[in-house]
């Protein structure tokens, strides 16, 4: 069996032979050619170590003869890159980096095996990767640009994963760096988001403007209107160029009232480099919807402004000294469309605060109107311009309507014209159905009063007549106290004589004992039948359903029909006859028929009526 010669050239590419560090149970990577190669097993590694100890590190052909299906080159690489105990796999030190730089200057950037011999514990592959990834001053370490991404995208469509060939098209970028950039960033964006697929279409529709870069800013000169305002020139709009490495941040642009003019050629790519926020795509879509709704609203307001009368102001003010006062807008060269212009009315800044009267902010509003005339524009820069102007424009529109309707002087703030009210009403009625919930008109809800329910009326009448209701716990102690308090109160009001109540046992206590005593219950049944026979045609109770009062009929009849003793008879006789009504419950005063049906006016039933009036109050609280 022929063996390959032992060739470990200093110029060889170590990536051609893949080595594995003790990953015995792993799988071979897909997409690579394996010429009869399999992973090294533990037995092969142990056997290789013993053979190296016996034969040294020079006789690789002899060592390979003891290992079936292994060549001398495979055995040599396995020992030098994996099994050699002198290998250093930790981080590089400053001394090692300095040594690599000196050796590369001496031997060149390709003789890595020779360079590795001067660095103990390092192999040629480690030295090569350290040089190209960290130490080579010619290798770019900056962020990837749009042109580089487009070059990689086009080359990858033609060459595939031939990174060495692609690296020749990008000076300053290594094949390893290009491969990592493609696998980590570009492939995902290209497959999921269609990154750079529409770049050719974008270049075809690019509109030539006066600005070769996207870093031009426009400033404004805020001057009062005078008789010489017709002689002003466009020099009031100077342009300032910012270098490529300088960028005006959003807070700075907001503070100095800067509006970024959109650059049309770099629309789909800039958001990829500005921020790596994963949620930025969602926010961009939301801003696009908000921008569309705002633009539609501004267009409708612009139509209303075209029909308004001439503007009368206390102190007329022009924007930036532009001589085109009526029917014209910002210079067409700013927006890249010299054929379309939108009228921009004069603005009375004397009625507004100094900050809100900035002409740059008003220009930002006009910028959104001009965007509809552009064939294509930069999404990122338009969003920046929208962020700088939309919020302040909405605040001005809510608080100071002089920008969207007839200006009002300081002396005329209290007198709002009909046109202002009409414009304000139209703005309030328009709702954005995409991003905002439609407002509920409270005037419709509150136009008619709500009719209170009869239950609320009854409660109100009860509280007005007897005071607020009190909720008490239903305990026997509280019920006894409440009954005594009610009896005492009604006794004081009706002039009841209660001399015997102080000397003898309370009537309520004795009644309770009689009810709880089983002997009295039997006696009450007997006396109940006796009294029912005595009262011939007397109607003691109101005609009600027997199903409602079945559980209490025996108790009430036994209590009310019991013969009255001499002492009780003396107490009852001391009550005036006209005070019978006062023993009814306060709730019973609501119905006058209750007294007629329940308390008879006959002489032979006065005692029974008095007893009934006393016990009917405790009807729902007595327990059988």
Swiss-Prot record:
GO terms, biological process: mitotic cell cycle; positive regulation of transcription by RNA polymerase II
PROSITE patterns in UniProt: HTH_MYB
Domain HTH myb-type residues, every copy: 32-83, 84-139, 140-190
Keyword hit for Glycosyltransferase: no
A Gene Ontology cellular-component term: nucleus
Note on domains (UniProt): Comprised of 3 domains; an N-terminal DNA-binding domain, a centrally located transcriptional activation domain and a C-terminal domain involved in transcriptional repression.
Described purpose of this protein according to its UniProt entry: Transcriptional activator; DNA-binding protein that specifically recognize the sequence 5'-YAAC[GT]G-3'. Plays an important role in the control of proliferation and differentiation of hematopoietic progenitor cells.
Name of the featured protein: Transcriptional activator Myb
Species of the source: Xenopus laevis (African clawed frog)
């Amino acid at each position: 069996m022929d063996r390959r010669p032992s060739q470990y050239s200093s110029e060889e590419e170590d990536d051609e032979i893949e080595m594995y560090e003790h990953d015995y149970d792993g799988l071979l990577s897909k997409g690579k050619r394996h010429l009869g190669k399999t992973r090294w097993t533990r037995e092969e590694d142990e056997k290789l170590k013993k053979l190296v100890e016996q034969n040294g590190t020079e006789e690789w052909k002899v060592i390979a003869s003891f290992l079936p299906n292994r060549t001398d080159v495979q055995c040599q690489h396995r020992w030098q890159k994996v099994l050699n105990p002198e290998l250093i796999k930790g981080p590089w030190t400053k001394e090692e980096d300095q040594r690599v730089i000196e050796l590369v200057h001496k031997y060149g950037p390709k003789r890595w095996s020779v360079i590795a011999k001067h660095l103990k514990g390092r192999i040629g592959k480690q030295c090569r990767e350290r040089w190209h990834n960290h130490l080579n001053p010619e290798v770019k370490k900056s962020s990837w640009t749009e042109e580089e991404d487009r070059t990689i995208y086009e080359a990858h469509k033609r060459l595939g994963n031939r990174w060495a060939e692609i690296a020749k098209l990008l000076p300053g970028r290594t094949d390893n760096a290009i491969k990592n950039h493609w696998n980590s960033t570009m492939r995902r964006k290209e497959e999921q988001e269609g990154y750079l697929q529409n770049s050719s279409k974008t270049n075809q529709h690019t509109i030539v403007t006066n600005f070769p870069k996207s870093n031009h800013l426009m400033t404004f000169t805020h001057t009062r209107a005078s008789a010489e305002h017709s002689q002003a020139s466009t020099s009031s709009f100077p342009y300032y160029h910012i270098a490529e490495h300088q960028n005006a941040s959003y807070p700075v642009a907001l503070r100095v009232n800067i509006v970024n003019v959109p650059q049309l050629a770099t629309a789909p790519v800039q958001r990829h480099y500005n921020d790596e926020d994963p949620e930025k795509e969602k926010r961009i879509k939301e801003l696009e919807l908000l921008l569309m709704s705002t633009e539609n609203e501004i267009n409708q307001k612009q139509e209303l402004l075209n029909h308004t009368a001439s503007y009368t102001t206390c102190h007329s003010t022009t924007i930036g000294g532009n001589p085109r006062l009526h029917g014209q807008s910002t210079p067409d060269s700013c927006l890249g469309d010299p054929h379309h212009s939108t009228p921009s009315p004069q603005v009375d800044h004397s009625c507004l605060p100094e900050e809100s009267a900035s002409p740059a902010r008003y220009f930002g509003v006009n910028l959104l109107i001009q965007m509809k005339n552009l064939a294509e524009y930069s999404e990122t820069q338009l969003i920046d311009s929208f962020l700088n102007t939309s919020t302040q424009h909405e605040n001005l529109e809510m608080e100071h309507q002089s920008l969207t309707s007839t200006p009002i002087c300081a002396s005329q703030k209290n007198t709002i014209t009909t046109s202002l009210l009409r414009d304000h009403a139209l703005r309030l009625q328009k709702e954005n159905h995409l991003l905002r919930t439609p407002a509920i008109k409270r005037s419709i809800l509150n136009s008619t009063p709500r009719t209170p329910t009869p239950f609320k009326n009854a409660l109100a009448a009860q509280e007005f007549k007897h005071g607020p209701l009190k909720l008490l716990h239903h305990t026997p102690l509280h019920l006894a106290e409440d009954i005594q308090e009610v009896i005492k109160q009604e006794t004081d009001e009706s002039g009841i004589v209660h001399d015997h109540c102080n000397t003898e046992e309370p009537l309520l206590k004795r009644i309770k004992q009689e009810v709880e005593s089983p002997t009295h219950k039997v006696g009450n049944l007997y006396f109940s039948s006796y009294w029912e026979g005595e009262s011939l045609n007397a109607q003691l109770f109101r005609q009600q359903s027997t199903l409602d009062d079945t559980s209490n009929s025996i108790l009430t009849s036994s209590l009310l029909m019991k013969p009255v003793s001499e002492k009780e008879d003396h107490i009852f006789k001391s009550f005036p006859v006209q005070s019978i009504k006062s023993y009814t419950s306060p709730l019973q005063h609501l119905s006058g028929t209750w007294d007629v049906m329940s308390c008879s006016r006959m002489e032979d039933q006065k005692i029974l009526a008095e007893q009934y009036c006393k016990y009917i109050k405790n009807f729902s609280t007595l327990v059988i």
